[in-house]
Amino acid sequence: MKQAIIAFLALVGAVALVGGGVMLWLNRPGRTAVSVNGRILTDRELTWRAQTLIDDAKRMENLLIPEKEMPRALEHYRRLAAKMWIVKEVLLAAAVESGVKATAADEKSSLEAAAKQLRVRNLTPEQFFKEGPIPEEVKRSDFREAVLIEKFTKREIETKIPFGAKEIEERTRELRELNAKTTKPGQPPRYKTDRKSVLEMIRQEKYNIAYRNLFRERFGKVTVECPAYPDLESVDGVSPPH
């Protein structure tokens, strides 16, 4: 759930302000930047989402961008936001096609998780939904979509991740050997080797692989057009092969 909530927080909200407080629009802010199965994200909306990522990095990671570097930074984050939006739309289409439904209880649970994420940003969910130029109803729609995607990926991935006792034992042994080789006197070991930590490490690795494979499979079933970044019309542009 944490991954879906973080993605949701990154994709919506924020004011499209660039260095010096100047509003930055492209020449045609209403033109299509990205389209997935006919669902359109305009240049203006893409800039909003890119600025969200910049603002969050400034707030949470102390990102400092010199004013003269802002155009380059904005372009970097616009491209990242385009990728994130494509991933969201591809998985949303898959979730809708699968017939999975998000209930009011699902949304309530996700909202509680979002509240914890927002707390470190000194925001409540209501403040987050209402602030910025993006209409509140659009933000709430994005949130509901994130909940649906989370429920779909949990069903398709999390509940199907296999674990074996031998695999856990081997990973625990490997981590202990690494700790013995890399831990300096007086320092704590680099890797946790309790069963819970080892299980989580294996689970996360398998989840990441399965998530990526699911996305690449579903990408082939949608139509992606990206005038802003044409290379993102290919699955390898969004999710490069290993």
Map each language-model feature to its residues.
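Amphipathic alpha-helical coiled-coil segments
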Residues: 126, 155-156
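Small-residue hinge/turn detector
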Residues: 90, 148-149
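Ordered, soluble secondary-structure elements with a strong preference for glycine-centered loop motifs
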Residues: 101, 122, 162, 201, ...
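Short, low-structural-confidence N-terminal segments
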Residues: 1-80, 186, 193-242
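N-terminal targeting/tethering segments
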Residues: 25-143, 166-170, 182-186
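Acidic/polar surface patches and capping/hinge elements
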Residues: 131-140, 156-187, 203, 212-224
